[in-house]
């Protein structure tokens, strides 16, 4: 191992990018910096009422440069010379259209303010109808079922649905695009100067989980399948968009001269392959086979790795994909998740905080006091509910405020609140929100357990896991399993740094690198036997309400007029 080697991990989240410098020999986190996306902060290019969420590529470029330069300037001159690799993770599926030169269309002047020419963020649900069409065609029997390895349901959050939707609604983008690229693949290509479609190295993680790529059918779905969806997928775009994929421990190139100068780093820095944030977060958390890693933030992503012999040729139903090498090369990566977790709490906070915002506008002299109350609202609600949970009067809340990802994706579903009375107050209702997110977490655990993929350990990471012990204890009690909290606040970036260390040759493989670099555990929560018993009937009630409510969100049948 190169003595003193340092790698950088870049974690592109929904709101900001984080840069982390890690000492490869010890896993010590040297420096970190977050940089927000300015256009996103201003709410530009997003229409929440329509479930439209877009990121401008310039936001990624500007934020990345600020964050990395800040970290690099904190390193000593020798440490800067010791940087041997950069790893990248991102949200996903977050794809964007590119031209023949590999430019994201929004970086061209004529598309600079066109949301359809930007990255379509993972939680954008404008492509529901297109996703349903893909699922229906997969189940039609006319073609092999390309959805079999992604849980049997194609989601509006994923690659092909978003391509179809944008192509249907925007002729200019459709005509200018020759391919589409995931954010986690684009950033390594940008840094290494390999953005042209023919030079792009597509990551196994994104391709297998979101693009219907699988070695069984030698890559992407056949042209006849895509033509049946819409001929534009093979006529307007290159076919195939790609064929080969790479695991994230393999290098895609080295830092280009331009980016070496912009970041203040040597040109021989290796750029490793990209993957989704939660998959790399699982590696940063030190995940082993049959450990369920819950990356908890605005939503959750639940990751497990399993040996190929146990999975064999089975298809795991209801999840978001099973992909060889998507997490750890040589193991099957399994993905699940909840479409909203922290976002639900944030929605409730905005709802209750509306009068405070209005009062601050009407009384500017008191605006700081009103803002303080608003900022501490969720913390105060959590404390109040924990002091007096009153589980016998817990409202029913279904955690579908942003649809359902797992089990069995359905983005038509909406949040549901029931079983209220005149005695229900704000803390009690917020307690219902906490319980709902824990119940959703349990359905994912049971989805794996019931398909002979036993959950042997549960790890939780992310801001909520580290800062909300009440919420984590409820999850622990509802799932009736020990729940370990990972110490690092930057597990996703840490995982990216681990992959960079392997790509740069510091370690031979990911498990070897994890032994030195992965995060330790902060604590392990144990289920409270009394609360386990009290939550059990409430969980069953949640499942009953799910069965009752889901059919109500099905699309209305088309009416047939009689003349």
Curated annotation (Swiss-Prot):
GO molecular function terms listed in the Swiss-Prot or TrEMBL record: ATP binding; D-ribulokinase activity; ribulokinase activity
EC number(s) on file: 2.7.1.16
Catalytic activity of the protein: D-ribulose + ATP = D-ribulose 5-phosphate + ADP + H(+); L-ribulose + ATP = L-ribulose 5-phosphate + ADP + H(+)
Keywords: Arabinose catabolism, ATP-binding, Carbohydrate metabolism, Kinase, Nucleotide-binding, Transferase
EC top class named in words: transferase
A Gene Ontology BP annotation from the UniProt entry: L-arabinose catabolic process to xylulose 5-phosphate
UniProt xrefs under Pfam families: FGGY_C
GO cellular component: cytoplasm
Pathway annotation from the record: Carbohydrate degradation; L-arabinose degradation via L-ribulose; D-xylulose 5-phosphate from L-arabinose (bacterial route): step 2/3
Annotated family: Belongs to the ribulokinase family.
Name assigned to this protein: Ribulokinase
Species, as recorded: Erwinia tasmaniensis (strain DSM 17950 / CFBP 7177 / CIP 109463 / NCPPB 4357 / Et1/99)
């Amino acid at each position: 191992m190169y003595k003193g080697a340092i790698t950088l991990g870049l974690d592109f989240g929904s709101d900001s990018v984080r840069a982390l410098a890690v000492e490869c020999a010890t896993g010590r986190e040297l420096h970190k910096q977050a940089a927000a996306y300015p256009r996103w902060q201003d709410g530009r290019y997003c229409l929440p009422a329509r479930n439209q969420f877009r990121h401008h590529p310039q936001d990624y470029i500007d934020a990345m440069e600020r964050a990395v330069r800040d970290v690099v300037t904190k390193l000593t001159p020798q440490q800067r010379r010791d940087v041997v690799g950069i790893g990248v993770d991102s949200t996903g599926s977050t794809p964007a259209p590119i031209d023949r030169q590999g430019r994201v269309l929004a970086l061209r002047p004529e598309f600079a303010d066109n949301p359809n020419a930007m990255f379509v963020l993972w939680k954008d649900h404008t492509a529901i109808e297109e996703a349903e069409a893909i699922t229906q065609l997969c189940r039609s029997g006319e073609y092999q079922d390309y959805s079999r390895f992604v849980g049997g349901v194609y989601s509006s959050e994923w690659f092909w649905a978003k391509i179809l939707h944008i192509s249907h609604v925007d002729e200019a983008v459709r005509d200018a695009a020759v391919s589409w690229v995931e954010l986690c693949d684009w950033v390594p290509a940008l840094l290494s100067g390999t953005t042209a479609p023919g030079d792009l190295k597509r990551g196994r993680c994104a391709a297998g989980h979101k693009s219907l790529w699988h070695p069984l059918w030698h890559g992407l779905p056949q042209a006849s399948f895509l033509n049946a969806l819409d001929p534009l997928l093979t006529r307007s775009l290159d076919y195939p968009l790609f064929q080969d994929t790479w695991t994230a421990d393999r290098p895609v190139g080295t830092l280009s001269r331009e980016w070496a100068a912009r970041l203040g780093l040597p040109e021989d820095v290796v750029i490793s392959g990209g993957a989704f944030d939660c998959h790399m977060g699982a590696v940063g958390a030190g995940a082993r086979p049959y450990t369920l890693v819950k990356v908890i933030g605005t939503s959750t992503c639940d990751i497990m790795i399993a040996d190929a012999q146990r999975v064999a040729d089975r298809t795991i139903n209801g999840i978001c994909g099973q992909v060889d090498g998507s997490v750890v090369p040589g193991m099957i990566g399994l993905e699940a998740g909840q479409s909203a977790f922290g976002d639900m709490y944030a929605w409730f906070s905005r709802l209750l905080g509306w009068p405070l915002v209005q009062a601050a506008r009407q009384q500017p002299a008191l605006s700081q006091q009103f803002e303080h109350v608003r900022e501490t609202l969720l913390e105060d609600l959590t404390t109040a509910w924990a002091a007096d949970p009153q589980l016998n009067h817990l409202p029913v809340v279904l955690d579908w405020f942003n649809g359902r990802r797992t089990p069995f994706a359905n983005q038509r579903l909406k949040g549901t609140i029931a079983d209220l009375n005149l005695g229900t107050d704000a803390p009690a209702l917020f307690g219902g929100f906490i319980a709902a997110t824990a119940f959703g977490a349990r359905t994912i655990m049971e989805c794996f357990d019931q398909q002979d993929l036993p959950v042997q350990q549960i790890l939780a990471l992310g801001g909520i896991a580290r800062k909300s012990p009440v919420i984590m204890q409820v999850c622990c009690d509802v799932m009736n399993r020990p729940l370990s909290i990972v110490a690092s606040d930057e597990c996703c970036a840490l995982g990216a740094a681990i992959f960079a260390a392997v790509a740069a040759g510091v370690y031979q493989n990911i498990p070897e690198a994890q032994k030195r670099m992965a995060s330790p555990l902060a604590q392990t929560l144990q289920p409270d036997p009394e609360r386990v018993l009290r939550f059990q009937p409430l969980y069953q009630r949640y499942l009953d309400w799910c069965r009752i409510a889901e059919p109500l969100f099905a699309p209305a049948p088309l009416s047939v007029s009689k003349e």
